[in-house]
């Protein structure tokens, strides 16, 4: 009785560099690193507020941290990465979601525009709440 050797397709470490779709996908997934950075910054801010017995000292030390040029640069990169993630997510979502209204599929543009409208509305509400 002979055993057949199972075929295992070779997979190199650079498999994702062959197609532009995979490159964009990997870049989109890499934006999570910057989300982790932003979470660390927020956690540091909470720790600054909580660790100082004087109410004003915590916010001053956190603002001093935020004014560091390296932190400013990383926050700008984080903003760009987040915007890239949002744009690609909003472009991809209507293709994945099948919303049926009166036995017809809703056009991609309607779903995409609704996502952008909700994003704009939440952003405006957040800005109003911050500056009231």
From Swiss-Prot:
GO terms for molecular function: succinate dehydrogenase activity. It is found in: Cell inner membrane. The keyword NADP does not apply. Keywords: Cell inner membrane, Cell membrane, Membrane, Transmembrane, Transmembrane helix. GO terms for cellular component: fumarate reductase complex; plasma membrane. InterPro entries: Fumarate_red_C, SQR/QFR_C/D. It comes from the Bacteria. Gene3D superfamilies: Fumarate reductase/succinate dehydrogenase, transmembrane subunit. It is a multi-pass membrane protein. The chain crosses the membrane at residues 30-50, 70-90, 110-130. The keyword Ubl conjugation does not apply. Its main location: membrane. Belongs to the FrdC family. Part of an enzyme complex containing four subunits: a flavoprotein (FrdA), an iron-sulfur protein (FrdB), and two hydrophobic anchor proteins (FrdC and FrdD). Anchors the catalytic components of the fumarate reductase complex to the cell membrane, binds quinones. This is Fumarate reductase subunit C. The gene is frdC.
